[in-house]
């Protein structure tokens, strides 16, 4: 695994200020002023949305009554969109106040000059999904492939990649040096919560069925 992507909110600070809100926790998302103002993609087809649903489970208890009670309260404020990138692009464009999304998507917009949005890690805690590099069995040049994987997982390689892409990815080597002006905060500055990946993976179909049934009952 060479980098991870943390669950975040993308918050339009101008619209947030107009509403007189401070959005930094899951409870803040329940404000009635945010009805129809929070974007999420469809967890049935979007890994970004599934990760956000998984993080709610991590904060409130995996597949617990407390988690589902929270989700039921949140659903009236949600707008489900077909594209995970819309959850930060449409917020940056001023169409919505908040998007439930992933850090590197928002970070890329910020790096490119978007100054009306922020990456908000929920103060309740966040979790991340991992991205791996793998050696293909019986590949023609395994030694070269191994050397490449070793490099991109090394502090030297990840420091070079951080400098190249402007600090918009969270690399996994603890000795990676952040480039000057990196958009993302250090992992040590973030509150992390453990995600029960085994349970969520084994019960994904049932959890999504629960989500779909609940959404139909709450929103129609």
Q: What positions do the PLM features span?
A:
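Extracytoplasmic ligand-binding site segments that recognize negatively charged/polar headgroups
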Residues: 1-95
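Extracellular/periplasmic catalytic domains that process cell-envelope and extracellular macromolecules
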Residues: 1-4, 31-33, 92-93, 111-112, ...
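Conserved C-terminal helix/tail region of periplasmic/extracytoplasmic solute-binding proteins
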Residues: 189-220
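A ligand-binding cleft/hinge motif common to bilobed small-molecule-binding domains
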Residues: 92, 97-116
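Short secondary-structure boundary segments
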Residues: 13, 42, 103-104, 164-165
């Amino acid at each position: 695994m060479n980098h991870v992507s943390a669950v975040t909110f993308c918050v339009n600070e101008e619209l947030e200020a107009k509403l007189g809100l401070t959005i930094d926790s899951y409870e803040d998302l329940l404000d009635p002023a945010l009805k129809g103002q929070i974007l999420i993609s469809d967890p049935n087809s979007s890994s970004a949305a599934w990760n956000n649903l998984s993080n709610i489970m991590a904060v409130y208890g995996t597949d617990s009554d407390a988690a589902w009670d929270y989700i039921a309260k949140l659903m009236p404020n949600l707008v489900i969109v077909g594209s995970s990138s819309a959850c930060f692009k449409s917020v940056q464009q001023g169409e919505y106040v908040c998007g439930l999304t992933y850090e590197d998507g928002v970070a890329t917009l910020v790096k490119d000059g978007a100054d009306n949005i922020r990456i908000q890690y929920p103060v309740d805690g966040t979790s991340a999904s991992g991205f791996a590099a793998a050696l293909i069995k019986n590949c023609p040049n395994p030694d070269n492939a191994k050397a490449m994987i070793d490099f991109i997982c090394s502090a030297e390689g990840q420091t070079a990649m951080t400098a190249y892409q402007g600090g918009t990815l969270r690399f996994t080597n603890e000795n990676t040096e952040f480039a000057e002006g990196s958009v993302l905060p250090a992992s040590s500055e973030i509150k992390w919560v453990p995600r029960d990946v085994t349970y969520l993976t084994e019960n994904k179909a049932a959890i999504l069925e629960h989500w779909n049934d609940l959404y139909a009952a709450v929103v129609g």
